[in-house]
């Protein structure tokens, strides 16, 4: 007999197709089973502080994007993108033989998720590659746009990030249509996993409607879950152009756009390309995240006809706005006002408008012998039927050059608003003009010497300002930084300007400002921005000395002072914190918990869990509460840099109870005597309550932790002070 197994049931079978389920084996799959968040859905999201770590990054630890970009053959890259635009692929045929419209949409939708309220979203990290954005209903077919770009990305590797490539491809598409753009800046660095910190909304179903008024105080940029801005069929697919105006203003306004910029962007974006709705949505398959393995990251496979080209279904709308959809023109406004418009439906059943009594003058994208009548989206007609939008639209109709200029500037703003200061900009096409939304800074005029720095430090030390005041003023200056859009920070000394000097959270810092301004003016050369940070250096060194430790707090000079005219008051007012748990401040009641807002603030400051922990503990014993209060100052030696906060918080001789029904303020009392020893807020007690934060707090409360505590506090402090120093890195 043969030694080989001749059992027919086993012959030729792939072992992976075995139908028998071994539950004990399946249960061992990593990440399977009921999760902590399933059990405790309100659990504090401390994990948000640990995203985008080195462990998820495939690049070398010392990879420097600025250095890699400097090696890029930029003209050749643009030439390759231009060639790609006109190289129609059989697997995804281009409209009119050009991908101009597709690439403009890709760039727009990459940048268009940005919102000014919290500075999150946008194209700055290449998030369109990841869920949920890669699967949003508004991003149907952009998986194909990104896949079309892959040969170019593959050729240039890490010399160009995906985040930069998306926007550059949109710019090149506009230029290839004959449009002159305002410029382009690179500098967006990719990340390697989805952003977890962005609140896209609470809805559980795609395309759930939100009333525009609900967006006023929320960091949401769209009126429906899964859209970039608004429903193109009008609010809740009403088909009413006039009723869409509030939604358009709310969503574009959350990006910092005014009426002129709104009109320019809508019209400019709809001067080129088309929408796709050749058949009913029932033909369209699942999104990329839900697609089977063999789809290789592509989704929305359509069973309608060929599934692409003339049969493509994207939004379900079938609209071509202009007679030259691959060439820049003023036809959008000419058609908008030349014709009366009648409501109709796309082949997919979506509401749109067609020009009444118009000749068929619009070229078909795949049949040169066919022509169509001009068509518009419901929200396009809003630019005619809203009185304020109409005024601007008619001006652009009569003056195409003003439209071109407005769109060029608005497009640059749209695609660069989340990049932060110009110091981050890279490349040969960076515009020279400073724009107010870039939070411009003057050029440095003096680099203070070590001797000058020491002289100013000595004057600060002799000023009579307390440790609390010195540390508070530096924290107030630097802690406005937002890691999302890279706005805020100490550079510019905007703490001394409106609106920051008037914020209630800065009350103590504002009181210390006049003395520090006098010291800075007497020095003659050092900037106020550097002086404010030096105040914190002096305060911390004094506090460490009081603890018996001699340290030199790192200080990097070279900051400059912004002028009031370089500061958009309304825009900067968005940086005013709802809460700053580092200073035991909360401006509003209701909404997220105080500890949730503390995590939010720490995440904006790009802090890790240990950094958050050590900073709060240090700031409490230094007495930096916004109002000078004693909440959370768990020490008998305020002003001394010690680990007392952690020691006393974790001391089991103290029990805690809510001071009132709000459970925002708590009393710590002696378990034996009942004597009240301390008061604290939720931003304090969370370091004993939350298991993850407590784990770090226990390290700093240990008997051998005093030196480590000071070292770690100084390191985290220095990080915050330099968060906005893009000029030196």
Swiss-Prot record:
One of its GO terms (molecular function) is catalase activity. Its cofactor is heme b. GO terms for cellular component: cytosol. Belongs to the peroxidase family. Peroxidase/catalase subfamily. It catalyses: H2O2 + AH2 = A + 2 H2O; 2 H2O2 = O2 + 2 H2O. GO terms for biological process: cellular response to hydrogen peroxide; hydrogen peroxide catabolic process. This is Catalase-peroxidase. SUPFAM superfamilies: Heme-dependent peroxidases. Formation of the three residue Trp-Tyr-Met cross-link is important for the catalase, but not the peroxidase activity of the enzyme. The gene is katG. It is an enzyme of class 1 (oxidoreductase). Transmembrane segments: none annotated. The keyword Lipoprotein does not apply. InterPro entries: Catalase_peroxidase, Haem_peroxidase, Haem_peroxidase_sf. Keywords: Heme, Hydrogen peroxide, Iron, Metal-binding, Oxidoreductase, Peroxidase. Residues 15-25 have a biased composition (Basic and acidic residues). Pfam families: peroxidase. PANTHER family: CATALASE-PEROXIDASE, HYDROPEROXIDASE I, BIFUNCTIONAL CATALASE-PEROXIDASE. The record marks 105 as: Transition state stabilizer. Bifunctional enzyme with both catalase and broad-spectrum peroxidase activity. Residues 1-33 are annotated as: Disordered. There is a cross-link at residues 108-229 (Tryptophyl-tyrosyl-methioninium (Trp-Tyr) (with M-255)).
């Amino acid at each position: 007999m043969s030694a080989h197994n001749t059992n027919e049931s086993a012959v030729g079978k792939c072992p992976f197709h075995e139908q028998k389920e071994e539950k004990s084996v399946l249960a061992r799959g990593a990440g399977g089973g009921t999760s902590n968040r399933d059990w405790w859905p309100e659990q504090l999201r401390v994990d948000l502080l640990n995203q985008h770590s080195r462990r998820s990054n495939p690049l070398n630890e010392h990879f420097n994007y600025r250095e890699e970009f400097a090696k890029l053959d930029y003209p050749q890259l643009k030439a390759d993108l231009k060639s790609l635009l006109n190289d129609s692929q059989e697997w995804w045929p281009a409209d009119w033989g050009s991908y101009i419209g597709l690439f403009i949409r890709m760039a727009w939708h990459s940048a268009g998720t940005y919102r000014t309220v919290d500075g999150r979203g946008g194209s700055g990290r290449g998030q369109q590659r990841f869920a949920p954005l890669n699967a949003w209903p508004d991003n149907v077919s952009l998986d194909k746009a990104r896949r079309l770009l892959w040969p170019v990305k593959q050729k240039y590797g890490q010399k160009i990030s995906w985040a930069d490539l998306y926007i550059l491809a949109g710019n090149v598409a506009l230029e290839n249509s004959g449009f002159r753009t305002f410029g382009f800046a690179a500098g967006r660095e990719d990340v390697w996993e989805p952003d977890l910190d962005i609140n896209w909304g609470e809805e559980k179903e795609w395309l759930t409607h939100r009333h525009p008024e609900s967006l006023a105080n929320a960091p949401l940029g769209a009126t429906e879950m899964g859209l970039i801005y608004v429903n193109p069929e009008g609010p809740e697919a009403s088909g009413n152009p006039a009723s869409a105006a509030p939604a358009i203003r709310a969503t574009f306004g959350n990006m910092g756009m005014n009426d002129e910029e709104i009109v320019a962007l809508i019209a400019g974006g709809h001067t080129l390309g088309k929408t796709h709705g050749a058949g009913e949505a029932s033909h369209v398959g699942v999104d990329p995240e839900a697609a089977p393995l063999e789809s290789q990251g592509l989704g929305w496979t359509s069973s309608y006809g060929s599934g692409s080209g003339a049969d493509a279904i994207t939004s379900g709308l079938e609209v071509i706005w202009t007679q030259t959809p691959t060439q820049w023109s003023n036809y959008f406004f000419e058609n908008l006002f030349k014709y009366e418009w009648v409501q109709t439906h796309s082949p997919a059943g979506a509401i749109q408008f067609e020009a009444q009594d118009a000749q068929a003058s619009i070229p078909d994208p795949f049949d040169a012998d066919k022509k169509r009548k001009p068509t518009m989206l419901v929200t396009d007609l809003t630019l005619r039927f809203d009185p304020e939008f109409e005024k601007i639209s008619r001006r652009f109709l009569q003056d195409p050059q003003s439209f071109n200029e407005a769109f060029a500037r608005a497009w640059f703003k749209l695609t660069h608003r989340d990049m932060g200061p110009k110091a981050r900009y890279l490349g040969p096409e960076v515009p020279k003009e400073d724009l107010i939304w870039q939070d411009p800074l003057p050029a440095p005029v003096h680099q203070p010497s070590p001797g000058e720095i020491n002289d100013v430090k000595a004057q600060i030390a002799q000023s009579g300002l307390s440790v609390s005041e010195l540390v508070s003023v530096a924290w107030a200056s630097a802690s406005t930084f937002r890691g999302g859009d890279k706005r805020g920070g100490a550079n510019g000394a905007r703490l001394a300007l409106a609106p920051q000097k008037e914020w209630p959270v800065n009350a103590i810092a504002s009181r210390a400002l006049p003395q520090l301004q006098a010291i800075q003016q007497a020095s003659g050369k050092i900037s106020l921005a550097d002086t404010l940070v030096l105040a914190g250096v002096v305060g911390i060194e004094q506090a460490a000395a009081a603890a018996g430790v001699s340290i030199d707090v790192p200080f990097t000079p070279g900051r400059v002072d912004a002028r009031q005219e370089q500061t958009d008051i309304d825009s900067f007012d968005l940086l005013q914190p709802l809460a700053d748990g580092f200073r035991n401040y909360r401006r509003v009641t209701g909404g997220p918990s105080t500890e949730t807002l503390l995590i939010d603030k720490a995440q904006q400051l790009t802090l890790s869990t240990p950094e958050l922990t050590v900073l709060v503990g240090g700031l409490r014993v230094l007495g930096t509460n916004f109002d000078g209060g004693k909440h959370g100052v768990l020490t008998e030696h305020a002003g001394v840099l010690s680990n007392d906060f952690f020691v006393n918080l974790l001391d089991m001789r103290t029990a805690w109870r809510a001071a009132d029904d709000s459970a925002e303020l708590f009393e710590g009392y002696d378990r034996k005597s009942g004597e009240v020893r301390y008061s604290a807020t939720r931003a304090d007690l969370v370091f004993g309550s939350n298991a993850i934060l407590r784990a770090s707090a226990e390290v700093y409360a240990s008997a051998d932790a005093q030196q480590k505590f000071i070292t770690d506090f100084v390191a985290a402090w220095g990080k915050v002070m330099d968060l906005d120093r893009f000029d030196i890195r």
